């Protein structure tokens, strides 16, 4: 009993020497962990948005696949390379829709210790493979068109070409209606401009733009079919259309390739201006300087940011963190943000590592 009293007294004596723990800072850290993901998803319905996007893409890709096969058959029967080129453009649309569907599926897979960013960039690799395959198909069609112009030994069935191209215009209109977004959505805490952009799924919007481009090409093929149907001696219009539409297909894929290279090289994504982000952070009260600002993207529609913010003395770090995060999220809707708060020192003005990148 005496030994218990002795150890109890010893414990009280040693405990009095332990420095006090700063509980408010611990509490703030817990709160910041609580709201950093909760507020990011509050007021939005990502799962229902993805389901709507999937339904639209399923319908459009099914229509696209069926008619692409029909155009290949019709182009073969009509001996028309222009229709074959239009089918190649449909292949571009179909491939982009498959990539979008794949990205919507793979983005729901959880990250692992090995793939700690998740599987987001599988979409980028698929897009690169799609572009390369389309270039091969287009190159073959251009080669055949050159051969036709040189030899002149070919016949085109104007009636079959006319029917097929007319159906192509109708099918592209149907696909456009299936992918068209009415613009109804929900917005909480964002500007009108930001909410109007966010309520449109980027995958569906990209597919819709592809279909509009293919519709214009199909109208061109239809005009060529009318010319050949009434004036069969003008059959050289077909290979000429093949050249023109091949340029259109390559132009479409070049924009995709540019986005792919930008993501793989971890460049600043489209829609996010480096200087604007920097000035927005410097406008937060208490922020004296910033450095190591990096902006890149996991995929085309998922920008990521990391930055070190230097704050003045006696400034609430958690308050600065909250304001900076809310402003960035409200204006740019970053997928992931990592913001490190540190104390400002005068030597940051002359430190080369603390200076921003060149233009």
UniProtKB/Swiss-Prot annotation:
GO-annotated molecular function: identical protein binding; metal ion binding; zinc ion transmembrane transporter activity; zinc:proton antiporter activity
Spans through the membrane: 57-77, 87-107, 124-144, 160-180, 208-228, 237-257, 292-312
SUPFAM superfamilies linked to this entry: Cation efflux protein cytoplasmic domain-like, Cation efflux protein transmembrane domain-like
Motif position, Mitochondrial localization signal: 34-37
Catalytic activity: Zn(2+)(in) + 2 H(+)(out) = Zn(2+)(out) + 2 H(+)(in)
Parts of the chain on the Lumenal side: 78-86, 145-159, 229-236, 313-359
Post-translational modification comment from the UniProt entry: Phosphorylated at Ser-283. Phosphorylation at Ser-283 prevents localization to lysosomes. Dephosphorylation of Ser-283 which triggers localization to lysosomes, accumulation of zinc into lysosomes and lysosomal-mediated cell death is induced by TNF-alpha.
Binding of Zn(2+) 2, residues: 36, 291, 308, 342
Tissue: Detected in intestine, kidney, seminal vesicles and testis.
Induction field: Up-regulated by dexamethasone (at protein level).
Sequence positions that bind Zn(2+) 1: 89, 93, 210, 214
A Pfam family that the UniProt record links to this protein: Cation_efflux
UniProt topological domain (Cytoplasmic) ranges: 1-56, 108-123, 181-207, 258-291
Motif (Lysosomal targeting motif): 281-282
Domain of life: Eukaryota
Biological process (GO), any one: intracellular zinc ion homeostasis
Location in or out of the cell: Cytoplasmic vesicle, Secretory vesicle membrane; Zymogen granule membrane; Endosome membrane; Lysosome membrane
Membrane topology, as annotated: Multi-pass membrane protein
Keyword Transport: yes
One of the record's GO cellular component terms: lysosomal membrane
Residues recorded with modification Phosphoserine: 283
Keyword Ion transport on entry: yes
InterPro entries: Cation_efflux, Cation_efflux_CTD_sf, Cation_efflux_TMD_sf, CDF/SLC30A
Subunit structure: Homodimer. Interacts (via lysosomal targeting motif) with AP3D1; in AP-3-mediated transport to lysosomes. Interacts with TMEM163.
Family: Belongs to the cation diffusion facilitator (CDF) transporter (TC 2.A.4) family. SLC30A subfamily.
Protein name: Proton-coupled zinc antiporter SLC30A2
Organism of provenance: Rattus norvegicus
Lineage: Eukaryota, Metazoa, Chordata, Craniata, Vertebrata
The gene coding this protein: Slc30a2
